UniProtKB/Swiss-Prot annotation:
Sequence similarity: Belongs to the UPF0301 (AlgH) family.
PANTHER family reported for this sequence: UNCHARACTERIZED PROTEIN YQGE, UPF0301 PROTEIN YQGE
Alphabetized Gene3D superfamilies for the sequence: VC0467-like (3.40.1740.10), VC0467-like domains (3.30.70.1300)
Name of the protein described by the UniProt record: UPF0301 protein YqgE
InterPro entries: AlgH-like
Lineage: Bacteria, Pseudomonadati, Pseudomonadota, Gammaproteobacteria, Enterobacterales
Any GO CC annotation of this UniProt entry: cytosol
Cited NCBIfam families: PRK00228.1-1
Amino acid sequence: MNLQHHFLIAMPALQDPLFRRSVVYICEHNPDGAMGLIINKPLENLQIEGILEKLKITPEPRDPAIRLDKPVMLGGPLAEDRGFILHTPPSRFASSIRISDNTVVTTSRDVLETIGTPKQPADVLVALGYASWEKGQLEQEILDNAWLTAPADLNILFKTPIADRWRDAAKLIGVDILTMPGVAGHA
């Protein structure tokens, strides 16, 4: 099972404060483990504009149609000072990894320098930190009913309101997660 370019959708019984009702976009999954970004936990009082200001990046030429007040996500509990930018192609940046035909993750400053300009990728999600699982850990958590999985959907990743992403990601596989009981069993 390879879950790269899939969503992990937290089951209602998952009560860890960070992962409760979370949707994680899996950027990498291989025999050694997995890495992903939480896409529905905005950091309080931090927007893309604030990141650009902190890094002394001024978008030029500025495209006024591009909003810089979008929230920055808490991507996960590891390396919370490190930025990850999920975006649609192209991946012409210094440190980009193509996740799927339609999704790229970049960690280099050059992608931030395009945000707010006509050169910005069409869709962008900025996160600080990431989530990681060791070999076999994610598979075991899925067997333990901590997560549902669904193929990633770009609309949910980039366009769905943050508050709706958990519910809408579960709907991708026909699940109304709001009506699920808090404890799941094995059949």
